[in-house]
Amino acid sequence: MTDLDYLNHAERALAAIELACDRINDASDADIDNQRTVGMITLTFANRSQIIINLQKPLQEIWMAARAGGFHYKCNSNQWLNTKDGSDFFVALSQHASEQSGQAVVFNS
């Protein structure tokens, strides 16, 4: 994958996270605050816990830090997969965000 392809896929993923936060906040009382800076999104929950998602351009990966730990994802055919177990980024984000917010939330690509 070229650097440009990586950036396009990664930026689409970050935009999808922002849109999902808006949708979740409109449809529930989850109250997920999302702040985006260049190449990074910080999700802050009502209990002040956070999930941080950032781009790792040299490795062409997306990293996620949650209470459960740190996870690395690489793009494979428009899907971000965990570099260790092959799990989907958005499924994992939904799981970690649900745990940290105390209610079921779903993030989609």
Residue ranges and their predicted role:
Residues 1-109:
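N-terminal intrinsically disordered, cationic/polar leader segments
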